[in-house]
Swiss-Prot record:
The protein's name: Probable S-adenosylmethionine-dependent methyltransferase At5g37970
Assembly with partners or alone: Homodimer.
Record note on cofactor: Binds 1 Mg(2+) ion per subunit.
Binding site for Mg(2+): 175, 261, 263
Xref: SUPFAM superfamilies: S-adenosyl-L-methionine-dependent methyltransferases
UniProt xrefs under InterPro entries: MeTrfase_7 (IPR005299), MeTrfase_capping (IPR042086), SAM-dependent_MTases_sf (IPR029063)
Length: 362
């Protein structure tokens, strides 16, 4: 059986292949829901709960799966600015000390927190107290009833681990033909679906314990349209191409076919109805907002260099862990050439459904 790392961080540092310099696709998506996030806080957040303890007038914000780079700082700054705007708008007198903000940046233990805090904007250090919170968001990372606003964007497709049967040679769910769940093999899809239900359920249960009554959890990310396999999306096509490039490396003796057959990504894109059903089954939250939206870059043809760099920043660590350091450069060099030879037909590819969801703790 293969051994995968317990965490799958984005590529760290600030070099040319780092997530910092290759996360503009995510940034555009986050910016696209910025106004929705502000509206949700202005309309749904009840600041009265902050005044229940006059000795600790603190609003605690957490960005779950923060990674590194400017995206997380932009998100939390928007939340803080909106809360301040709400207080001014309501024009209420709050008892006790002035409101202070604490921001917890959560990601897996081997996330590059050093780079994260080194690149934090200087002005924000006067706006809020920063804390790094290493740990899997599939479980609790904070004390009970300590969180007021939680946020996560484009993270929930990451699983806590690869489904066990997917990498078991004796299992009918062995994902030997692909390196992802592209919904083309029923047994594989079922194994991933079960793992996702468990992990997403764990995420929601953990947030229910951490959030105060009336606290908000803001989610954004991607799902598949019902009835559409991931293999028909451009993202699915690219990952299948990466699998083909790995097989080319096996033919050259750079890696082995057996290693490839025992490698599968710990990611799963649920169908939109499946995702909604998982949320609605949790009785700890009221669903305040549930919208299906499009990604601002859905109708823009992305360059091959952009695609290669984006996927390298996302997958570098896990591929290096499984196949070794010497494989990564050659793999993504071959991906770039394959994309040049077989360009993605964005008009024919199916598009993800992007979601924006606001949950309120009962």
């Amino acid at each position: 059986m293969p051994t995968f790392p317990q965490s799958f961080p984005m590529n760290g540092g600030d070099g040319p292949h780092s997530y910092i310099h290759n996360s503009s696709y995510q940034k555009v998506a986050i910016d696209g829901v910025k106004e929705r996030t502000s509206e949700a806080i202005l309309e749904k957040l009840d600041l009265e709960f902050l005044n229940r303890n006059s000795e600790e007038n603190i609003l605690r914000i957490v960005d779950f799966g923060c990674s590194i780079g400017p995206n997380t700082f932009d998100v939390v700054q928007n939340i803080i600015d909106t809360v301040k705007q709400k207080r001014l708008k309501e024009n209420k007198t709050y008892i006790g000390a002035p409101l202070e903000f604490q921001v917890c940046f959560n990601d897996q233990p081997n996330n590059d927190f050093n780079t994260l805090f080194r690149t934090q904007p200087f002005f924000s250090r006067k706006e809020y107290f920063s804390v790094g919170v290493p740990g899997s968001f599939h479980g609790r990372v904070l004390p009970k009833n300590s969180l007021h606003i939680g946020h996560t964007s484009y993270t929930l497709h990451w699983l806590s681990n690869v489904p066990q049967h997917v990498c078991d040679k004796k299992s009918p769910a062995l994902n030997k033909s692909y390196i992802q769940c592209n919904n083309l093999v029923d047994e594989v899809t079922k194994a991933y679906k079960i793992q996702f239900r468990k992990d997403f359920g764990g995420f929601l249960e953990a947030r229910a314990e951490e959030l105060v009554s009336g606290g908000l959890m803001i989610l954004s990310g991607q799902c598949l349209p019902d009835g559409i396999p991931k293999a028909l999306t451009w993202q699915g096509v690219v990952i299948d191409m990466i699998g083909d490039c790995l097989m080319d490396l096996a033919k050259l003796g750079i890696t082995s076919k057996e290693k490839i057959e025992l490698f599968s990504l710990p990611t799963y894109i649920p169908h939109i109805s499946e995702f909604k059903a998982n949320i609605e089954q949790n009785e700890n939250f009221n669903v305040e907002t549930m919208e299906e939206i499009s990604h601002p870059m859905d109708y823009m043809p992305l360059t091959n260099d952009f695609i290669t760099s984006m996927f390298r920043a996302i997958l570098n660590t896990i591929i290096e862990e499984h196949f070794g350091e010497g494989v990564v450069n050659e793999l993504f060099s071959r991906l770039a050439k394959r994309l040049d030879k077989y360009p993605i037909d964005f008009k024919r590819c199916k598009k993800y459904v992007n979601y924006f969801i606001v949950l309120k703790r009962k």
